[in-house]
């Protein structure tokens, strides 16, 4: 086999290795905390003939993304006049690092535009952060207003689960107040997490969390997991019969703890693809080495 074929194989090997790198990058570029939980879009479209609202909205997005490198909560109002101002905020989950917070929040402006378009108010909630904005004069809602709920499909009634979950709820409610707005813990294989919006006091936070937990008990019953999102706080729980998995955040995504099997399936698929691509790359490298040796031997015999 000539030098030209060897060159082709070398190029193929480089392409395979590049693909392998892209697969690893793609896997690491979509962390758990960027999963979309829900969106809330005002029905009324934004009338903006002067473009002032758009300017204020763009400035607000820029401020929120910039501040997400320094803090997990930030609220601001932008605009040239009070009539054309926009108030917005973001909040990251309390267990995220500054870097993770930024990675989460930086996705929200684009997502908000894609999911809601230009409306007078919008809210986009990911697993690890959310963004909210509204124009001046937008009607306010109660902090206890239910925005979104989800309960796991599997039930675990009759196993003592509800008693354990309710005990975990009590621990979490006290912990959120003591933690000034965020708390996560595990109690007898029940993982619970609660967080309040960063601009409310401990007393209001406690009331909001209590309301959310009561809703979780009623709405989700004996479901293996659940999430309740109110306007000013949210709670989530998940029961893991075999123990809470050791990972950066076992906070349940918007299905149930059964969703962990989905994550596991995704991870298995990724590993399988990586093994196939890696194996192919290894074989390709071996073939190239053998051909290189063959060419050297051929050249040696040609010289005699």
From Swiss-Prot:
InterPro entries: Cell2Cell_Antifungal (IPR051378), GNK2 (IPR002902), GNK2_sf (IPR038408). Gene3D superfamilies: Gnk2 domain, C-X8-C-X2-C motif. Disulfide bonds join 41-116, 92-101, 104-129, 151-220, 196-205, 208-233. Disruption phenotype: Both pdlp2 and pdlp3, and pdlp1 and pdlp3 double mutants show altered protein diffusion (measured using GFP). In pdlp1, pdlp2 and pdlp3 triple mutant there is inhibition of GFLV 2BMP tubule formation. Virus cell-to-cell movement is negatively affected. There is a 22% reduction in mean surface area of infection foci by GFLV and an approximately 12-hour-delay in long distance movement in comparison to wild-type plants. There is also a systemic delay in Cauliflower mosaic virus (CaMV) spread. Keywords: Cell junction, Cell membrane, Disulfide bond, Host-virus interaction, Membrane, Repeat, Signal, Transmembrane, Transmembrane helix, Transport. Residues 273-293 are annotated as: Necessary and sufficient for plasmodesmal targeting. Residues 34-138, 143-242 form the Gnk2-homologous domain. Residues 27-272 are extracellular. It is found in: Cell membrane; Cell junction, Plasmodesma. GO terms for cellular component: plasma membrane; plasmodesma. One of its GO terms (biological process) is plasmodesmata-mediated intercellular transport. Residues 294-304 are cytoplasmic. Residues 1-26 form the signal peptide. Highly expressed in inflorescence pedacel and shoot apex. Expressed in the outermost L1 layer of the shoot apical meristem and in the epidermis of bulging floral primordia. Within the L1, expression was restricted to the peripheral zone (at protein level). Its main location: membrane. The keyword Nucleotidyltransferase does not apply. Modulates cell-to-cell trafficking. Belongs to the cysteine-rich repeat secretory protein family. Plasmodesmata-located proteins (PDLD) subfamily. (Microbial infection) Interacts with Grapevine fanleaf virus (GFLV) 2B-MP. This is Plasmodesmata-located protein 3. The lineage of its organism: Eukaryota, Viridiplantae, Streptophyta, Embryophyta, Tracheophyta.
């Amino acid at each position: 086999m000539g030098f030209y074929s060897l060159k082709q194989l070398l190029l193929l090997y480089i392409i395979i290795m590049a693909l392998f790198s892209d697969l690893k990058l793609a896997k690491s570029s979509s962390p758990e905390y960027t999963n979309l939980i829900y969106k809330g879009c005002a029905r009324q479209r934004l009338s903006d003939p002067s473009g002032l609202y758009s300017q204020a909205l763009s400035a607000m997005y820029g401020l929120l993304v910039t501040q997400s490198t320094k803090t997990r909560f930030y609220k601001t109002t932008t605009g040239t006049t009070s009539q054309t101002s926009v108030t917005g905020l973001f909040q990251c989950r309390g267990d995220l690092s500054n870097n993770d917070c930024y990675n989460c929040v930086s996705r929200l402006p684009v997502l908000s535009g894609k999911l809601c378009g230009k409306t007078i108010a919008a809210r986009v909630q990911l697993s690890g952060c959310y963004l909210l904005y509204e124009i001046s004069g937008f009607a306010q809602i109660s902090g206890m207003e239910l925005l979104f709920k989800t309960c796991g499909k599997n039930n675990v009634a009759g196993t003592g689960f509800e008693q354990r979950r309710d005990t975990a709820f009590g621990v979490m409610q006290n912990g959120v107040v003591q933690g000034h707005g965020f708390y996560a813990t595990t109690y007898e294989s029940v993982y619970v997490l609660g967080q309040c919006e960063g601009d409310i006091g401990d007393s209001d936070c406690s009331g909001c969390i209590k309301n959310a937990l009561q809703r979780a008990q009623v709405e989700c019953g004996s479901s293996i997991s659940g999430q309740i999102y109110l306007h000013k706080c949210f709670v989530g729980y998940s029961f893991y019969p075999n123990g809470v998995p050791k990972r950066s955040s076992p906070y349940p995504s918007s299905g149930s703890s059964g969703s962990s099997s989905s994550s596991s399936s995704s991870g298995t698929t990724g590993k399988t693809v990586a093994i196939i691509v890696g194996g192919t790359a290894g074989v390709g490298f071996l073939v190239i080495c053998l051909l290189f040796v063959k060419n050297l031997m051929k050249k040696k015999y040609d010289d005699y």
